[in-house]
Amino acid sequence: MFAKSLFFLALFCVSFAGNFTIAQDSYLLNGKPIQLMSAAFHYFRVHPDRWEDTFKKLANAGMNTVETYIAWNMHEPERGQFNFEGANDLDRYLTLAEKYGFLVIVRPGPYICAEWEFGGLPYWLLKEDGIKIRTKDPKYMEPVTQWMNTLLPVLSPHMIMNGGSIIMVQIENEYGSYPACDKEYLTELYDLTVANLGPATQYVTFTTDGPSDGMLTCGRLAGKAYSTVDFGPGNAHNPFATMRKYEPVGPYQNSEFYPGWLDHWKEKHQRTGAEPILKTMTEMYEMNANWNFYVFIGGTNWGFMSGANGGGKSFQPQPTSYDYDAPLSEAGDRTAKYYAIRDKIAEWKTLPQYEVADSEKKSFGEVAFTEMASLWDVLDVLDAQPVAGEHPVTMEKLGLDYGFVLYQTKLAAGGELRVTDVHDRVYVYVNRKYFGLIERQDPTRARWRSRRRRAMC
C-alpha cells in the first residue's frame, strides 16, 4: 500500500509536454477545442504577497487563462543589470499560475503601453542621441536583443511544450497605433522569439490591434503571428468581422475586453456598469470567441511608474492608482462586477471554490507632522554633485531614472521665462521663493515675466 501511494504521488507531480494550436474556428489545447476566458493580472502592479490570493479569486470567477505584460524597465532598471526577484519574480508568478491550473498569455513587448512609465521601456534608452524606439534602428534593437535574449530563456521552462502553461506570446503591442509601421522591426522581434522559445508550432504568436483597417494593416505580421483585436462592451460582431478580413481562418479573439477604464489626473474616477459587460461577454461566448478581460485586477502604479496617454501636444497622465473599475479592486477586493461576471460564467460551467477573503481595512488615526525642511535647507546634505553647463541637461543624460532635478542659474536682470516643451512638470522659484508651475498638459502657463533686477532661478 505504501509503495502504491508513492507511485501515485510521483505520477501526480510530473508535468507533461503539450501543445496549443489554431484550428478552423477555435484554439486546440492538446488537440481538443478550448474557449479562453482570460484575466489580465499584471504581476508588477500587485504586491507579490497577494499573487496567490489573486489567482484563487480569478479561478473562482471562472477564468481559465491569465494574461500579463512584462515590464522591461522593472527587470533592467540600468543597462545590463537584470532583476528577476521579489516583485519581479516571473518564475514564481508563472509557477503559481500553473499551480491553480491556468493557461498563460504573455505580452513581453518590448513596448507594452499599459499606461505604465514609458510603455515599459527603460529610461536609459534615451541616453542615446537620435534613438528611434519601436523601429529596427540598431540603437534600439541592440538593447532589445540583449533584453529578449535574457527574458525569453526565463519563460522557456514555462512554455506549454516544455510542461508549462504559456500558450501565447504577443509580438510588440498594438503596433498599428504607432506611426512607424516598420514590418522589418516586427519580423526581428518574431525571430528573437522563436530563436529563444522554438518554432511557433506548439504555441501561438500573435498581435493585438484596434479593430480598424489602418491599425490591423500596420500592426499585423502576416504568416507569422495571429492577428487579434481589442474592444470594450458593445456589438462584438463588427470588430470580429474586421478581424476576419485579415484572419480568414481561426478563432475570434478579443485580446483586451474592457470591463472598466483608466483614469487621468484632474478627471473623475471611471465607472462601467456590469450589464453591458455581461451582454457582450455572452455574445462572445455564443460566438465561441475568446476574450481577455483587460484588466481583471488593475493594482497600483508604484513610485514614479504611472504612465500617460496622449500624442503631440496632448498629455493625460495617469494617477498612482490603476484601479480601472476592474472586477477586482486595486486592493484585490471582489466587487459587485466580479460577482456578476462569476455568476454568469457559472451558468456555463462548474467553478472552483477556493477559500479567499477580501483585504483587511484599518484606520491608523491621525498622524501629526511636527517638523519640516525645505528643499533649500537640505541641498548641502544631498548626495549629488552639481553639473555645470550652458544649457539644461536632460534627466537621462544625468543618469537619473525618476524623481526630480534642480536646475539653477543666475540672471543679471529680470526677464521673461519661456518654456516650450517640458516633460513633465516644473516648479519655478525666483530667489528661493515659489513663482509658479509649468505642466506639460497646460503649456499656456509656461511664460512669466520677472522685474527683479537680479534673480536666481
Label for each model-derived stretch:
Residues 415-432, 457:
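Aromatic-lined ligand-binding clefts that engage carbohydrates, nucleic acids, or primary amines
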Residues 86-106, 128-166:
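An active-site-proximal structural segment forming one wall of the substrate-binding cleft
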Residues 51-119, 123-125, 190-198, 203:
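Aromatic-lined substrate-binding rim segments of carbohydrate-active enzymes
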Residues 320, 429-457:
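Beta-strand-rich ligand-recognition modules
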Residues 95-98, 102, 195-196, 230-329, ...:
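Catalytic-core region of carbohydrate-active enzymes that cleave or remodel glycosidic bonds
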Residues 139-224:
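Active-site neighborhood of glycoside hydrolase catalytic domains
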Residues 80-88, 98-99, 109-135, 186-190, ...:
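Aromatic- and acidic-residue-enriched segments that line the glycan-binding/catalytic groove
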Residues 2-9, 13-65, 95, 101:
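N-terminal carbohydrate-binding accessory modules
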